Amino acid sequence: MLFLQFLFLDVVLGGSITKNVVQENISFYLMQISSYANQSWVQNCGSGWLGELQTHGWDSESGTIIFLHTWSRGNFSNEELEDIPLLFHVYFSGLSLEVQDRVSQLQIKYPFDIQARAGCELHSGEPPKGFLYGALNGLNFLSYQNKSWVPSPEGGNRAQKVCDLLNTYEGIKETAYHLIRDTCPRFLLGLLDAGKMDLQRQVRPEVWLSSSPNLKPGRLLLACHVSGFYPKPIWVMWMRGAQEQLETKQGDILPHADGTWYLRVTLDVAAKEAAGLSCRVRHSSLRDQDIILYWGHGLSVILITFAVIVPLVLLIILVLLCKKCCTYQGIP
């Protein structure tokens, strides 16, 4: 979900954004997981995603869409939005019946999962691209290409049989084509427009350093913590002067409850070589003002503060005790 503001303007203005802007793409897609425990039990889970941001959920009990943001409806009319849950209900019902009827024929053993990912991508200066992929128990099974169902190599003969069957249903092929090539791009543009205030927000990261003993004697594991930033794309690196430390290891970017992100970047280094290292953070919210924290500087400040405050506190306590003793001595 990179540089959404540029993408939005690029789409609306027909690709007129300066060529110096890094070209990215944005996608909207639906995720489906259907779990079949036995011949009579199936659970369908669905969700909608704008890039890496979840925008929709699916209530399988009521057969309704869950809108996770105030702008999750995009600019579709109420009539259009009412048609979509009905379409999903028909799809899930039909899929369950077909699958249960053909489990033996396809030699599929319970329990098993069917996954699907369908949506569209917008690339700067290019027409929208639709996609639809299906998987069985986590392995690629089939895809939709050029108005036809195509088996994946991992799916083997079983996938070929399913595609041969699906390709006989012209109505299903036309519906799939219409959804990923027409409906999805229109809905994606509507989401970008309706949610542009949220999607374009910039939140500066907070950065701090820490260390922990390494398993190897004489070494330290330095950690650079970056928290509370939005949007997600960020660059963090341990540096020595202008030299990037290639041994830097980046963890997963983890979400906060408020929609911002957290990242921890570490460097395994000899304790005697830690001096002179720094952590550098680049983020769109910082513009060109990178955050740079030097290892040891914060520790030095703490030690200096501790060295000044502790004697001062002790001196104050000593003075108070002396005054108290003098007071007691003056009492007859």
Swiss-Prot record:
Pfam families in the cross-refs: C1-set, MHC_I_3
Quaternary organization: Heterodimer with B2M (beta-2-microglobulin).
Chain segments annotated as transmembrane: 301-321
Cytoplasmic side: 322-332
A GO CC term attached to the entry: endosome membrane
One Gene Ontology term from the biological process aspect of the record: antigen processing and presentation, endogenous lipid antigen via MHC class Ib
Swiss-Prot/TrEMBL keywords: Adaptive immunity, Cell membrane, Disulfide bond, Endosome, Glycoprotein, Immunity, Immunoglobulin domain, Membrane, Signal, Transmembrane, Transmembrane helix
Domain Ig-like, residue spans: 205-292
InterPro entries referenced in this protein's UniProt entry, alphabetically: Ig-like_dom (IPR007110), Ig-like_dom_sf (IPR036179), Ig-like_fold (IPR013783), Ig_C1-set (IPR003597), MHC_class-I_related (IPR050208), MHC_I-like_Ag-recog (IPR011161), MHC_I-like_Ag-recog_sf (IPR037055), MHC_I/II-like_Ag-recog (IPR011162)
Stretches of the chain found on the membrane's Extracellular side: 18-300
Main location as per UniProt: membrane
Annotated source species: Cavia porcellus
Additional record remark: During protein synthesis and maturation, CD1 family members bind endogenous lipids that are replaced by lipid or glycolipid antigens when the proteins are internalized and pass through endosomes or lysosomes, before trafficking back to the cell surface.
Protein name, UniProt field: T-cell surface glycoprotein CD1c3
Membrane topology: Single-pass type I membrane protein
Subcellular location: Cell membrane; Endosome membrane
Cysteine disulfide partners in this protein: C120-C184, C224-C279
Signal peptide start-end: 1-17
Residues carrying sugar: N25, N38, N75, N146
SUPFAM superfamilies registered for this protein in UniProt: Immunoglobulin (SSF48726), MHC antigen-recognition domain (SSF54452)
Function: Antigen-presenting protein that binds self and non-self lipid and glycolipid antigens and presents them to T-cell receptors on natural killer T-cells.
Repeat among keywords: no
GO MF annotation list: endogenous lipid antigen binding; exogenous lipid antigen binding; lipopeptide binding
